[in-house]
UniProtKB/Swiss-Prot annotation:
Its main location: membrane. Catalyzes the transfer of 4-deoxy-4-formamido-L-arabinose from UDP to undecaprenyl phosphate. The modified arabinose is attached to lipid A and is required for resistance to polymyxin and cationic antimicrobial peptides. SUPFAM superfamilies: Nucleotide-diphospho-sugar transferases. GO terms for molecular function: phosphotransferase activity, for other substituted phosphate groups; undecaprenyl-phosphate 4-deoxy-4-formamido-L-arabinose transferase activity. The keyword Glycosyltransferase applies. Disulfide bonds: none annotated. This is Undecaprenyl-phosphate 4-deoxy-4-formamido-L-arabinose transferase. Keywords: Antibiotic resistance, Cell inner membrane, Cell membrane, Glycosyltransferase, Lipid A biosynthesis, Lipid biosynthesis, Lipid metabolism, Lipopolysaccharide biosynthesis, Membrane, Transferase, Transmembrane, Transmembrane helix. The gene is arnC. Coiled coil: none annotated. Belongs to the glycosyltransferase 2 family. Pathway: Glycolipid biosynthesis; 4-amino-4-deoxy-alpha-L-arabinose undecaprenyl phosphate biosynthesis; 4-amino-4-deoxy-alpha-L-arabinose undecaprenyl phosphate from UDP-4-deoxy-4-formamido-beta-L-arabinose and undecaprenyl phosphate: step 1/2; Bacterial outer membrane biogenesis; lipopolysaccharide biosynthesis. The chain crosses the membrane at residues 235-255, 270-290. It comes from the Bacteria.
């Protein structure tokens, strides 16, 4: 594929989970931004098993006769990245843009992403300026970004921002990957030849709360560690070797001290011995837990169950007809 291949159609993929308050504004603003494009466009909204009225709102929007919206309804909640992959499976554009439904990243940035992608980039990432999140979220995001950069060698500054643009061949490459734990920005960068980042505005969340709770962030960190690299397993081997060497040295030292100071001294060191023993046992359990994480992910991948199940797609044929009329 030529690096400067023209973009004839843009697909916007937006995962939605319990966002009924923000959906009307999201649809209006995204549609208005897309109308500024010179290319044809489609807006794919993926309902990730919402329990509020999001499903009904998406269905109504996709059934609008003048709409460019496709609604993909999943049968339950599978997670943000699985929902985006479901959207990727439906896209027909040459450039695919992902966007969160909470409106913290403005849809009005869409034309900028398209313009930058036309310069020949495979992936256009974004960095949130003046980020409007809690200190906890900012700190957690900073730690995750540093970990990703060290593991991948890609020095992109904000992997947590989902407002990103991907060329179609990058999306097709990602669709050929069937692992269960998928972090799309990282996966895309493994296939991209040319990447760049632009700074975008970041607004406060107007409706509801973030879907990433503390436990979800911890699970995300485990996912990233185990799906990115096998470095933790290598570190375990090094730590295990160091502990074994330390244990051997400590044993020799205890024997020497017993010979020098007699059996009375050895009795006084029982608590020290137990403390060191518990430290070694604790390290072993940590290692076993990490190894179990890897084995569990291998087990999930070997079962080859689908990432998601699409219950219904609304508006696909209608969107194609609207594109033909505009041509």
């Amino acid at each position: 594929m030529s690096l400067n291949e023209p973009i004839k159609k843009v697909s916007i993929v937006i995962p939605v989970y319990n966002e009924q308050e923000s959906l009307p504004a999201l649809i209006d603003r995204t549609t208005a931004a897309c109308k500024l494009l010179t290319q044809a466009y489609e807006i794919i909204l993926v309902d990730d098993g919402s329990s509020d009225n999001s499903t009904e709102l998406l269905t109504a929007a996709a059934n609008d006769p003048d709409s460019h919206i496709i609604a993909i309804l999943l049968n339950r909640n599978y997670g943000q990245h699985s929902a985006i992959m479901a959207g990727f499976n439906q896209v027909s554009g040459d450039l695919i843009i992902t966007l969160d439904a909470d409106l913290q990243n403005p849809p009005e940035e869409t034309p900028r992403l398209v313009h930058v992608a036309e310069e020949g980039y495979d992936v256009v990432g974004t960095v949130r300026a003046n980020r409007q999140d809690s200190l906890f979220r900012k700190t957690a995001s900073r730690m995750i970004n540093m970990m990703i950069q060290r593991a991948t060698g890609k020095s992109m500054g904000d992997y947590g921002c989902m407002l990103r643009a991907y060329r179609r061949h990058i999306v097709e490459a990602m669709l050929h990957c069937h692992e269960r734990s998928t972090f799309i920005p990282i996966l895309a960068n493994t296939f991209a030849r040319r990447t760049t980042e632009i700074t975008v505005h970041h607004a406060e969340r107007e409706f509801g709360n973030s879907k990433y709770s503390l436990m979800r962030l911890i699970n995300l960190m485990y996912d990233l560690i185990t799906c990115l690299t096998t470095t933790p397993l290598r570190l375990l081997s090094l730590v295990g070797s160091a502990i074994a060497l330390l244990g051997f040295t400590f044993s020799v030292l205890l024997v020497a001290l017993r010979l020098i100071f007699g059996p009375e001294w050895a009795g006084g060191g029982v608590f020290t011995l137990f403390a060191v023993l518990f430290m070694f046992i604790g390290a072993q359990f940590v290692g076993m837990g990490l190894l179990g994480e890897y084995i569990g992910r291998i087990y999930n991948d070997v079962r080859a169950r689908p990432r998601y199940f699409v219950q219904k797609v609304v508006g696909a044929e209608q969107t194609e007809n609207n594109q033909d009329v505009e041509k």
